[in-house]
């Protein structure tokens, strides 16, 4: 029997207590299954039981009856109820059944049971052996109380139970005979102070109102359907009860005066009444319900006369049980008159056609009809039973007996129960004849369970009776609209139990009371009331010093409390603005403390550990210092010792993890290499053949090789920690202790996955541990980290650590960076309460290390150079590694000009300036610094030397130095990637200026020179060209005037070249300037169409913004640009020092020659003019009066065709006096001409003009032309610089 699941049945006194014990070799599961099989036949029909030789208990006396067996596996303590056996004999355990699964001797087993349980009157054995021996079978056949079944308890169980029932009836007959000649005393008279008297906490108002609910109210409540009707009924109950009670008192006084003349007669009547009451109890056990009803009626009649209230109440209880059992059997009966007197009954009115009505169904559909006949309310036909015997007729006429079909039976039972309590209350005034508190309480309990069973239905049906008799109880899914007993009435009735001093009762009795009330509250849906009662039950269990025989299902009690409190699901978050929530959390805390104490008392360390963890985890903020200390020392530590707690309860202990490299003093040894795929390097080299610099940005050597795995990813905030095998690293973790007691950390380890590659130094942990973490503090623990093995490309995450706390096994704890604030919008279960941290770690193999030993000629990597010179250096480096070779090496120079430029420098520059700048940058990146004889492999600990050539011929004046970036590394073992490192060597270069070109000019050449000056280099060059080419004239040349300044401290010799012209060597003293003239042919505009040639781009792919220049401005920019490029690309100058001719250099004219202006472009590039003009004379020298022809050829250029809308322009011939440079008038006496000096010319084709001239005065004359849009010289579009000179002698 599970005392924690006690739910007494109202008809419990009719059930035979039967103890079932195991004999042999049973397991708990097998024995429980066997008892369960036996329990399936707990109801035995008397008609199936063999008759016995007893007129009182023979089954033949009432074949409709049944025997109810209540199977127990735990026996009652006889000492607790010994004094109650004379008053309520049904409390005794009568039958014992030994289940035997071996081949032991039956007689031995019977003797064992009689010795161990001597008070049990009917011992029986049931053999469940598989194959009993023949001798055993013969023994079983010869013994009446030994039976044989199968191992699965399926064979002959019903027959066996019928035989056990017969044995019980036989034993009961003998047992009852001992009562016949015994004076029956009340429990208080037998036990004295050992029997606890019922004690009420406050004055019981029960006797004045609710104890005698009249039957008029019982019957009228059937038809009540409104609240107003209920109030009226209540008033009727009170007034009817008062009138009935007064009449009963007067009637009883008259009868007592005539019947009780002496005290001896009174004693005899009391003894007789008690004997009849005991007989009724035994007849209930024997299934003789009609006889029991008669016995109880006789007992009530007698006891009522002598005012034996205790036994009278018990007899009334027996009558109500008889009513229910007869209704359960479906038999009709009548309510005795004595019941009508004590609990006045009014008949219900039905239609006259009612015949053969079942008492069950008659009470299932009550009606408010007041007609003289009733409508049948069932279809069950029950044989009519004989009325109770005539002893009841002595007080009243038979006409006062009421058929059960005419009353509301549930309310009658409730009315009788109230009357029983009324008599029990009256008995409390006696010093020995009082109701023991256990009797009082158990009667309240079974009445409460009866009302609860009726509450679950709106009609008194067969199902309700089954629930009452078979003690079936389960929670309702749907509450009926009109239950027989409203829920509030059942609840108020349960409060009567709190009017008693329950704590003085035996602990077993308290457990029964509290467990029953808890189940009632569960069925009624009062969860908090259920929780309250279960807490009282726990307190009662905890307070008793006695050893309690705990049922294996005791955990259900604790689990129910935890479930009602919603502890497992709820989070203990306190809201200071909600006092009710705080109170509820405090209640949860106290219940948990209680559960821990109870679990500890019964040595259930698993539950102690479970609830201790919940309490310390979720309710820390509600526990003070002493509570936390006691919880830790008394429960948590012992649970850890006995291994009930195997893991630390706080998952948020680990707050931060940091891993740092311990750096060396040499910064180059601390460098982490980049990891790059071999394929990416090969494709990069192919791309560099066509493009060495990213066109979008200035040159950046570290964008040439992108690492494949170790790349800073802006999308993730977790950086990758990269280490090298053999690195010294330091591991630091921060742990928190939010509790008010100290704890120790015994071990810290990394996760298994990463421990293969790196691990915390175990020796350091053993040496410095354990680590004590003070209460309510955070401690940092720092330990060495050993880097063992490379992970290569794979990246591992450290999101947790394995920590051993309080000597518990290693346990994983996530890294908690911070707590996340609650989001009122986001309430999903997936919303995490914490911000978890993690470290990404990658371990590369051991790497080579390159160091610079020396650079020749330099002191501290600094050097002074003359502008325009070149020099060589020898650089010596060494591989410091003793095990790793360098099999990839690349040197990338980077000067300060490239470093200073912004990435978007090109966006606001015009195309011509951009070309000049990027051409210079391109030269700087390709030609300024060159590496010679670079090795491909450097072995471990090998020293090598390579050459570096520094060219300063074209560097700008703001060049101050460069960095030599040595990119080196080693291939992976599988050659899938290369690990790259860099060594940056800075060099400072100081430039000293040598030859500068401060100014430059361009002038036309219009006449030839005499032979006397042909020794000049440039004149000699022009004259030789004219002689060699007949169509070449002096006007086809221009003169480039260059000023060279020597800014150095020594003299310099230099020469200039332009195409095939080479000047003489000029000596320029220090701080002096010399002009050198360079003859240059004019640019043939027919061959070089500059206006249609765009300015080139060094780095194609630029997305230029519109410059804002119109077409003419663009053409003008192109012409200026290409004229400058034409000159600079062919102009060269070499020099050497006069003091040391081994020091040579060159001049980069890009640094000195600015953009050309319009005059320079007009002079060097005729395509800029509207017309190409040629002036030709037959002879350059004539005599006075000699006729000469002047031929002028004009050819319109593309400029003319693009800009001119008209088809004709006008050409004016202009004559100058070469000596005075004055223009001669059109009409003069020095030169005569035939025709007009103004001639029309075409804008689309070549025009040829001939003019005959007769000089009449000696002199030197220049002929030139002026082209205008009209014949009056307005709108001049070109005044040609071309002229021809005529000498007249």
From Swiss-Prot:
Annotated protein name in UniProt: Trafficking protein particle complex II-specific subunit 120
Family affiliation: Belongs to the TRS120 family.
Quaternary assembly: Part of the multisubunit TRAPP (transport protein particle) II complex composed of BET3, BET5, TRS20, TRS23, TRS31, TRS33, TRS65, TRS120 and TRS130. Interacts directly with TRS65.
Pfam families: TRAPPC9-Trs120 (PF08626)
Gene assigned in the entry: TRS120
Polar residues composition-biased segments: 354-365
Domain of life: Eukaryota
Sequence segments annotated as region (Disordered): 354-374
Positions of modified residues (Phosphoserine): 379, 387
GO cellular component labels: cytosol; early endosome; trans-Golgi network; TRAPPII protein complex
Subcellular location: Golgi apparatus, cis-Golgi network
Extra information: Present with 259 molecules/cell in log phase SD medium.
Keyword set, alphabetical order: Golgi apparatus, Phosphoprotein, Transport
Annotated GO biological process: early endosome to Golgi transport; intra-Golgi vesicle-mediated transport; retrograde transport, endosome to Golgi
Protein task: Specific subunit of the TRAPP II complex, a highly conserved vesicle tethering complex that functions in the late Golgi as a guanine nucleotide exchanger (GEF) for the Golgi YPT1 GTPase. TRS120 plays a role in the YPT GEF activity of TRAPP II in concert with the two other TRAPP II-specific subunits TRS65 and TRS130.
